[in-house]
Amino acid sequence: MTLKKLNPITPGSRHRVIIDYSKQSKLLKPSTKNAPLKKNTLKIMTTEGRNFHGVITTRHRGGGHKRLYRIIEFNRNKLGVSGKVNNIEYDPNRTANIARIHYQDGSKKYIIHPEGLEKGANIIASAIAPLSIGNSLPLKSIPIGTEIHNIEFHPGKGGQLARSAGTGALVSYKTNSFVTLKLPSGRSRYFDNKCWATIGKVSKAEHKFINLGKAGRSRWLGIRPTVRGSAQNAVDHPHGGGEGKAPIGRIPSTPWGKPALGIKTRHRHKWSERFFKGLKKK
């Protein structure tokens, strides 16, 4: 995939950067003509960032285009059943594309589309599956140096890690019970070797270079404007108030007065810290 910067014909296209699919192989190009699988979609009601009390718990959410949720098979539980990639589709609910799989038993499912998985390719989930892109195996069956995605935290729960566009983890070390993976963040973590993962990294790695070009496209995605703290009143934000433009005048803070910008927010005594013990970030 390559990137394309649009000419500044209009204000909205001045800084617009998109993914150019015109030079890509037809076997890897996502299709927008086919409707999503009816049995694999759900209607989702947006909460506009509010909880059940109506209080805003996540700011800058609201609006957006109406969409159907595609049910993704994160838990590849059709063991030993081969499936064929029928189509590659756009998913409005995630950064990566998705692949429509037609299994030999007649069922149809969606999976996260790995980079390089072509239309017409066959995939399978098995402990003795070949190390081909899109195949799912337990970590104990995956050799060191393999790039993987859709990784389980707990055996049988379904993939929860490395699912966004362009992400992948690397198998770096193996013991009798655990496998060490280098995560997209750069940290290494221990995983139970009975957890399953999918071979390859997620497609659409160029997503991080996309520039929406105008505010309206953010609103289509359900993202509302973010107002700088220094532009607010003192009653609304610790950075607010003052005459004209004023410096922060204190430690950079969140709207609730907690330290911001570079402060670690992960709890040092969280139970899962044991899986990082003795492993340094590289």
Swiss-Prot record:
Q: Known SUPFAM superfamilies for this protein?
A: Nucleic acid-binding proteins (SSF50249), Translation proteins SH3-like domain (SSF50104)
- Any single Gene Ontology cellular-component annotation: mitochondrial large ribosomal subunit
The primary site where this protein sits is plastid
Q: Which PROSITE patterns match?
A: RIBOSOMAL_L2
Superkingdom, natural source = Eukaryota
Alphabetically, the GO molecular function entries are:
RNA binding; structural constituent of ribosome; transferase activity
- What is this protein identified as? Large ribosomal subunit protein uL2c
Q: Which gene encodes it?
A: rpl2
